């Protein structure tokens, strides 16, 4: 007699294959995430006077500012350039992450409630 909520004799063949495929996909995703975390993404703003670098962990690792961009009378402009460069670097990181996940999932964007 089957256990309540289970299948007689264990999982059907297709379900077993599906589980193996899901486990393989999970391993690949973990490997890709580890690779991504070791990468850096840089972006510039203001014609290159501000450069921001973020890691695959989405942490700012470096900010370079050309001294000519520092105007004590216009600090707001420098702040805007830093924000713009940071957002662009984060966008590059996100694009790379999505591209890697698409390779693994084969474009199953809705799988898992949109986790990918």
From Swiss-Prot:
Keywords: Cytoplasm, DNA-binding
A single GO molecular function term of this UniProt record: DNA binding
Principal location listed in the UniProt entry: cytoplasm
Claim: Cytoplasm is one of the keywords in the record: yes
Alphabetical list of Pfam families matching this protein: YbaB_DNA_bd
Record localization: Cytoplasm, Nucleoid
Keyword Lyase in record: no
Ranges in a coiled coil: none
Positions of the UniProt region annotated as Disordered: 1-42
InterPro entries per record: YbaB-like_sf, YbaB/EbfC
Compositional bias of kind Gly residues: 1-12
Gene3D superfamilies on file: Nucleoid-associated protein YbaB-like domain
GO CC list: bacterial nucleoid; cytosol
Biased composition (Low complexity): 13-26
HAMAP family per the UniProt record, alphabetical: DNA_YbaB_EbfC
Family: Belongs to the YbaB/EbfC family.
Annotated function: Binds to DNA and alters its conformation. May be involved in regulation of gene expression, nucleoid organization and DNA protection.
Subunit and partners: Homodimer.
Name listed for the protein in its UniProt record: Nucleoid-associated protein EUBELI_02017
Lineage, highest ranks first: Bacteria, Bacillati, Bacillota, Clostridia, Lachnospirales
